[in-house]
């Protein structure tokens, strides 16, 4: 954190402002998401201080403050889960996953990422955000185990979350997923639109996302009976194995 001070309408203000994405708290992240898509500079000011003071700044103060937040231009390699917990409409608290997905099983991931690719963030939230397990001892996953039936029950609440909360959950997930795609570049491919060719005149086509189930089954080969074992492994463990297999296959050509 960095301390800044300035004067507005004859009154002196002091604020401790974040110097990186990792220093933002959940409320500041929500403020950024709420206005960032429309006015990034305003988002920076509101992240730094309360919005009443922020909108009262002079043009020179505005310029000076936005320079303090140039780090916000870099949304690459962000490794923090800002939305650590969510309060549902019925008052129940759902807890999120580790920023590195180390407490997310491969089965959870295949469900969550598939729904994320379809823009069904309410379902993705119901997969990754869950109630606290009664026997939690701070040494295990805080959340109750993932099940498809539990997800359906949680959807009754996640489908009622306000739009801003869903946008925050979605952006945070995309940020953390980007770290995985950068680290495991051999196995991730995204639905990027192909350029329209002048020869065919065809409309751009979207490439499909990585088919996780197909990748796993290719890796298992004849050992299909081990599928459940892989589904129970953590996301980093499976991605590491997949990446290694792909590299070996490429080098063997």
List each language-model region with its residue ranges.
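An amphipathic, hydrophobic-aromatic interaction surface with interspersed Lys/Arg
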Residues: 1-253
């Amino acid at each position: 954190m960095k301390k800044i001070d300035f004067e507005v309408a004859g009154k002196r203000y002091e604020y401790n402002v974040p110097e990186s994405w990792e220093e933002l708290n959940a409320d500041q992240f929500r403020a950024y998401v709420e206005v960032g898509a429309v006015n990034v500079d305003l988002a920076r000011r509101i992240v730094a201080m309360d919005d009443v003071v922020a909108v009262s700044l002079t043009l020179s103060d505005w310029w000076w403050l936005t320079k303090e937040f140039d780090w916000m231009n870099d949304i690459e390699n962000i490794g923090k889960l800002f939305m650590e917990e969510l309060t549902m409409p019925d008052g129940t608290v759902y807890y999120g996953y580790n920023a590195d997905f180390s407490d997310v099983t491969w089965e959870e991931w295949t469900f969550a990422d598939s729904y994320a690719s379809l823009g069904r963030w309410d379902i993705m939230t119901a997969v990754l955000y869950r109630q606290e397990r009664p026997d939690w001892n701070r040494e295990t996953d805080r959340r109750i185990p993932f099940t498809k039936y539990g997800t359906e029950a949680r959807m009754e609440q996640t489908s009622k979350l306000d739009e801003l909360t869903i946008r925050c959950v979605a952006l945070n997930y995309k940020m953390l997923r980007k770290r995985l795609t950068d680290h495991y570049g051999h196995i991730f491919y995204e639905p990027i639109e192909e350029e329209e060719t002048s020869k065919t005149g065809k409309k751009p086509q979207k490439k499909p996302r990585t088919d996780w189930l197909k990748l796993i089954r290719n890796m298992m080969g004849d050992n299909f009976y081990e599928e459940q074992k892989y589904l129970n492994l953590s996301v980093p463990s499976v991605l590491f194995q997949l990446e290694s297999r792909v590299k070996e296959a490429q080098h063997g050509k």
